[in-house]
């Protein structure tokens, strides 16, 4: 769970601590357990990892049965896990406020069977729901809003062709498989700048189901995009 601190803290790892400081009755600090943290990954990588793990609790994800985010409308990211032969189950998840890791298993490993969903999710829901109660109460006050996950200012969003990885052209939208657009985040300076060189527009005979030739009736011809596949062979092929 401690490793996940770098995702929510813009790439800075913070070691777990059971206390921050101890003071006497006059407020004098007797023990100080402050920790500055260490840079483990870049801010951009931390943001991208959080974006990826935000999909896990959503519909279709391995933690889709998690109720916390739908109940409280607080940002959640995390990852489920399981050991070989389902001896152990995990869920480590975090919000902009706290990180919580849950392990489910036996002291002496044995198969965990007859469980439709990851049991760690219910425990995580209960624990995180309780410790976020003060945040939910604060949200009811005028002007108060929940914290949200930070997105690095050095990231840009870009739409590209999923076949070439380059910027879209009109041909990409005429692929027989449907629109080939994909949207992703990139570190500034690494986003695609060239245009797709894989899709090629051709005249297509919709009746014959093949590339049109000069004898095809004009009324049967439409334009479609085919993907140009570069083949490289170790030797010259005749």
Predicted features along the sequence, with ranges:
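A penicillin-recognizing enzyme superfamily signal
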Residues: 1-205
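C-terminal functional modules
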Residues: 194-238
């Amino acid at each position: 769970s401690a490793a996940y601190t770098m995702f929510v803290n813009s790439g800075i790892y913070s070691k777990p601590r059971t206390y921050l400081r101890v003071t006497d009755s006059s407020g004098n600090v007797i023990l100080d357990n402050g920790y500055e943290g260490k840079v483990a990954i870049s801010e951009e990588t931390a943001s991208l990892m959080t974006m990826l793990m935000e999909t896990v609790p959503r519909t279709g994800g391995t933690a889709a049965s998690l109720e916390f985010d739908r109940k409280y409308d607080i940002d959640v990211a995390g990852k489920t896990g399981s050991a070989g032969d389902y001896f152990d189950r995990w869920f480590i998840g975090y919000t902009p406020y706290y990180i919580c890791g849950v392990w489910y298993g036996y002291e002496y490993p044995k198969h965990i069977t007859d469980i439709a969903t990851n049991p760690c999710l219910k425990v995580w829901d209960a624990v995180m729901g309780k410790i976020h109660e003060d945040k939910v109460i604060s949200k009811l006050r005028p002007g108060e809003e929940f914290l949200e996950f930070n997105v690095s200012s050095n990231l840009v969003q870009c739409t590209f062709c999923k076949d070439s990885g380059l910027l879209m052209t009109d041909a990409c939208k005429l692929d027989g498989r449907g629109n080939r657009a994909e949207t992703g985040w990139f570190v500034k300076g690494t986003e695609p700048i060239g245009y797709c060189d894989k899709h090629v527009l051709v005249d297509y005979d919709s009746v014959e189901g093949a590339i049109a030739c000069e004898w095809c009736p004009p009324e049967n011809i439409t334009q479609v995009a085919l993907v140009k596949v570069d083949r490289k062979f170790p030797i010259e092929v005749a």
